[in-house]
């Protein structure tokens, strides 16, 4: 039944052959020969098959059991009844026969009696009649009468032949004959009787047949049971086996009978089954249970066990009947199904979860994209505003106007910074941030950053730069990004520090453990390969301050976007909360780590460690040599090995217009003069502080030194005072005047003072620019198809003091480049005839190959006569700046991929143009 | 006389501000104005004139292209609108620029109805702007003629 149900359930699955419950290859040889699991032939041949009984039973106790159990006894009673019934039937038949015979005999005897009577009458014997008795008299009379009547009827016959002998003879003969016949009949009856008796004997045959039938039925039963995958058994009250069917083959009779499960088997499930049986025995209710056995004997098998209590005639429990069916496969399948269903559910749940996540991610991406686009859209006009303000600041303004303008510029810068932050962040997050590997000097960078910070410093803070001696002069890395990080951290430090020091400390450290762990192998290989030319160095950079510090509980969320240590801080100090997030992301992008340690009201230290590639150490020593005899060197060597810079607060710091020299983000037009003893571009510093601080770093006007752009114009090496002579004396008195005025004034005063300064420095700048122009006027080519854009750009260029040539499309650009040499190309991306990207590719191809073959192939008409001219030209890389309406990551990627150096987003503003020219025109 | 100049100046300032506030112009126009100096006193007017000529030409181009019912060269329209977008962005014609962006989108999706509708709007918008700027330049001229200085307008 169970088996059937199971097969129904697994119908869709492959119906497999049910294997034998017990393994085939166990059991003793002796057991085996009786083990006729599957007799050959079909059921019809059952009679011929000798079915050995596999039953092991205690023969002495079985009858007892049978007698004492209900089933046994009732079965036996049935048999007996049936047998009795058959016997009765036979007996009844025989009795009837006997009755018949008896009757026949009685008849015969009656006849005989009659004959004898008749004979008596013939002999005429006197009858003894009691005389005295009246009744007898009466009886006699009656008899008389009767006899009379009888005699009377025969009297005549007798009378007739009475006299003759012949008659008597005849009479005797006939009597004799009758006797004979009678005897004969008797004999025949006797014969019949004996025959009857014989048949009686043969009546025992049905019993035998019955026995045979019984045997056959039993055989059939055995056959069925033998093939059935079940174990059956009977156990007594103590759960000792009295009987078992289909036992495990290797167990012998004596191993099982009289023993309990626990005694026979060992392992899991045995105890359970034993308990279950006992429970059934106690409760007296048949029940089923699935039990998994794990025994040494047959491993792990699951059995469906049915146990029922057995009662004797008196209604007392005497044991249990036990039936077990192996359902291991079914259980396994069922479990598999359950597992599958569970897996399915889990997968579905995960899928929906995933969908949700995807949805959220998409939403986030869209939001980010939106933010980036929006930021960009805001940035373009804003930079216009700021740029215009800057241009405005170069014109003649009264004090009030200038003050307003400065506020406008600084707030504009702030917003620009914020938008740049957002764009940077989305760039890093979307993975399109490209890192560049350029050689740079860490000392210069630190100095420059501090210098810039000092320029916008409005507090009495000392800025310090400290670079360990073992830091290489030159390393390779993405200097722009590193500068960005430093600037960010420094401006943070300054923001949260009211007095004391802020500084940067650089030192070489051994490879940090977080890298060593996961990149040990790769790195060593690299070292081996590049050992001669290039090695990696890890530089640890601390940006420390003596500021308000950060409470410990705020540290974890410090690097999260839009998070600041507390809302109070955000209100008090402003800021977007993006700076640190960007720093962290950038540092991680470059394979480093940014950490922070801080104590409240003692200060914070932000530390980032980054790997850099280093050139050969030869370079270093070369630089050293160069440095050693620097007497009449340019200003550069000063930076190369200088390990310590300090920017002390000069009471009433002087702001000056530094001109276009600084390419940094923050208020690039301002530079603070802080070096105590130096004259910079003729500005005099506090002469009282004139102790020889040769270690001190001096601030030059607007970082010209770094850019080394206008060396020729002023050539101000701070070490040699004679260079200040360069016609700056005229400012002397004015500057000292403003110094003193600013000393006495607050911030507002500083603004006022600036106007004068600006005028002078502006004049100076113009002068410098004319000088530059005279020496080498840069040639700029604008490739743009939109007349209005051309007009605007041209006008801006004019403002910046440049003129430029115009090409209306890529082909014209190529022709122009072919015929004349340019220092910079501003290239629109989207143009008719030949777009900016393709044109750039062709120009780059020309630079590489020295011919315009690629362009000619592309269908650009280049006159051959000019080719010769071309070949003479130096094949320096021509800076090509893209002008694009869309600065989103992909577009800029495309620009870079096509060989462009940078890009300006449209609409072009004065500020953008100026930055670009600063970067690419030397 | 001074009162007239002051009046004109105030009028000019208000009018300029209204143009910004109503979204006709954006900061790029301010940028243009900064580029105007002694060397090129009519710079803005020149650029703007060029722009309106450009507008006229491009719009008629697009109108012609969109007139070819059933056989509209959306690529042609697209390149024209790209040009117009660049120009309007450069002069700070904010509304025209915004419409150009929408028109470009319609064009990219080949939405004929949208294109036609947008183009009509662009036409209206640029003409309005032209009229307004004309007014503004007239005011400027009046100020100059009255001997006044064109005031700086902070937006």
Swiss-Prot record, chain A:
Low complexity bias spans: 738-747
EC number: 2.7.13.3
Topology relative to the membrane: Peripheral membrane protein
4-aspartylphosphate modifications at: 828
Binding site for Mg(2+): 785, 828, 830
InterPro entries: CheY-like_superfamily (IPR011006), HATPase_C_sf (IPR036890), His_kinase_dom (IPR005467), HisK_dim/P_dom (IPR003661), HisK_dim/P_sf (IPR036097), PAS-like_dom_sf (IPR035965), Sig_transdc_His_kin-like_C (IPR004358), Sig_transdc_resp-reg_receiver (IPR001789)
One cellular component (GO) term of this entry: plasma membrane
GO biological process: abscisic acid-activated signaling pathway; cellular response to hydrogen peroxide; cellular response to molecule of bacterial origin; cellular response to nitric oxide; cytokinin-activated signaling pathway; defense response; ethylene-activated signaling pathway; negative regulation of abscisic acid-activated signaling pathway
Any one GO molecular-function label of the UniProt entry: protein histidine kinase activity
Upregulation: By H(2)O(2).
Transmembrane segments: none
PROSITE patterns referenced in this protein's UniProt entry, alphabetically: HIS_KIN, RESPONSE_REGULATORY
Protein name stated in the entry: Histidine kinase 5
Source organism (scientific name): Arabidopsis thaliana
Taxon lineage: Eukaryota, Viridiplantae, Streptophyta, Embryophyta, Tracheophyta
Underlying gene: AHK5
